[in-house]
């Protein structure tokens, strides 16, 4: 919640499936996020407003969202789940407006979140790694799109000449 409290009884259905997967021998888990918690979003919702091209995550909550992701990872790791990957953004090329949980992202916003998440993983002493880039279609990884969203991500994130979006040097980025 807005005070930093966690209710671990929420998302009981997802937790049930994790328990069953572990019971049947799954030994690696990936945590991903559709949206930041609403207390961290610009509009107070888990979806973006129409016409928004950048992230719905408020500029002053990148570190908070990263901490939320790592606190959640630590909680489930402590419960015996081998959380190996954290995917902080889901299909960032889409609008994700009313009726669908999610957020559009630009490469700049993703890189900013990745840097905060890298710090938080290190601070919490986790072994999980960041899974990026993330795309709804293969072409978003290597082509420019019509929207000013997460496109041509391989170039943006891994070419050292892209100083605002380069994340290839992050310690906790999956290679």
Regions found by a protein language model. Give the residues of each.
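Glycoside hydrolase catalytic-domain groove-lining segments
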Residues: 9, 16, 123, 155-175
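Substrate-binding cleft and catalytic face of glycoside hydrolase catalytic domains
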Residues: 1-151
């Amino acid at each position: 919640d807005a005070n930093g409290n966690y209710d671990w009884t929420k998302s009981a259905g997802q937790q049930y499936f994790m328990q069953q997967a572990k019971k049947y021998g799954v030994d690696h888990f990936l945590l991903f996020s559709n949206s930041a918690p609403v207390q961290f979003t610009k509009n107070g919702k888990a979806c973006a407003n129409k016409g928004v091209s950048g992230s719905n995550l408020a500029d002053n909550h990148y570190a908070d969202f990263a901490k939320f992701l790592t606190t959640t990872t630590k909680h489930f790791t402590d419960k015996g789940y081998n959380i190996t990957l954290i995917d902080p953004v889901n299909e960032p090329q889409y609008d994700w407006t009313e009726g669908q949980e999610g957020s559009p992202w630009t490469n700049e916003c993703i890189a900013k979140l990745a840097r905060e998440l890298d710090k938080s993983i290190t601070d919490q002493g986790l072994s999980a790694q960041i899974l990026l880039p993330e795309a709804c279609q293969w072409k978003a990884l290597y082509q420019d799109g019509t929207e000013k969203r997460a496109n041509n991500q391989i170039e943006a994130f891994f070419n050292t000449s892209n100083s605002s979006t380069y994340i290839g040097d992050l310690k906790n980025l999956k290679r």
